[in-house]
Amino acid sequence: MKFELDTTDGRARRGRLVFDRGVVETPAFMPVGTYGTVKGMTPEEVEATGAQIILGNTFHLWLRPGQEIMKLHGDLHDFMQWKGPILTDSGGFQVFSLGDIRKITEQGVHFRNPINGDPIFLDPEKSMEIQYDLGSDIVMIFDECTPYPADWDYAKRSMEMSLRWAKRSRDRFDSLGNKNALFGIIQGSVYEDLRDISVKGLVEIGFDGYAVGGLAVGEPKADMHRILEHVCPQIPADKPRYLMGVGKPEDLVEGVRRGIDMFDCVMPTRNARNGHLFVTDGVVKIRNAKHKSDISPLDAECDCYTCRNYSRAYLHHLDRCNEILGARLNTIHNLRYYQRLMAGLRKAIEEGKLESFVTEFYQRQGRPVPPLNVD
């Protein structure tokens, strides 16, 4: 992987990630394909929304179908027939969200398989091996996603263990001879001094890119913005910056304003299945009765397959009848909305008009622009 940085506007950056499997224009949003599929979508449909890279879930693909089935096909690309790059998370977030059925040690994490209850162990080395078999174009280190709220002492211990696990991840990644990219993950909760130690330690180990983890886990938006404003300038400028698990459209806008290059989130797909659709002026809840006889498109400014062909009334009807097609059409639209938003942000950065774009984005939704506390 090669990262090319073209231009900046304030702290926002316009560039691209170059892989053997294709080019990803940044800032980029990555749809989430947890089980080897972006829910309800064929790879061709995902590509048609404008997505150039997707995310796969190491933890879930390890449990089902498992490494051996994956290797029978080649790798995850061959298994699911996605031709572009794939980033895989390390499994850390899923393990730590298991709560009471897991035990964290210095060696790794002991837990019960949520499918059948069998005892399982996952550590940095195993995570690197699974992601190697998946053929991930971007591999994420195995870390502890520090929960929120966490006091300073807990956050410090968690961050320090994540640093030790980062080194173990790096060592196993290298010993496997993996030629793809490995990203470090910055932890430290909402504490700037801990984030400083994490960034410094990860840069000393050396990675192809750096993710900001442990945000969007329940902390106030002001804390997320503050940590991004503090951390992003410390990440080497020639490396991509990835904000994990984020988020709402406004979170993407605010991340880009603060220097983030990559995002992922289940929100566009999950919300689509719940009839919660993103449009230029905000959100449409398609199951509301007011859409029953509305023959207008979902979003007159959207060029997606759904908006070009179907009315709000039809989408409302499908949702009320629990038709699978409704969830699919909604997903196509939400994914395209996110990609159109990213394309708009990229163009605004190129033209040096990002803040004008941001102002219009919030004005269309009748909301104030959040403050930006950067030099």
UniProtKB/Swiss-Prot annotation:
Recorded superkingdom: Bacteria
Region described as RNA binding: spans on this chain: 245-251, 269-273
A cellular component term, taken from the record's GO annotations: cytosol
Family matches, as SUPFAM superfamilies: tRNA-guanine transglycosylase
Position of the signal peptide: none
Enzyme class name: transferase
Pathway recorded for this protein: tRNA modification; tRNA-queuosine biosynthesis
InterPro entries xref list: ArchSynthase1/Queuine_TRR, TGT, TGT-like_sf, tRNA_ribo_trans-like
Subunit note: Homodimer. Within each dimer, one monomer is responsible for RNA recognition and catalysis, while the other monomer binds to the replacement base PreQ1.
Protein name: Queuine tRNA-ribosyltransferase
Gene, per the UniProt record: tgt
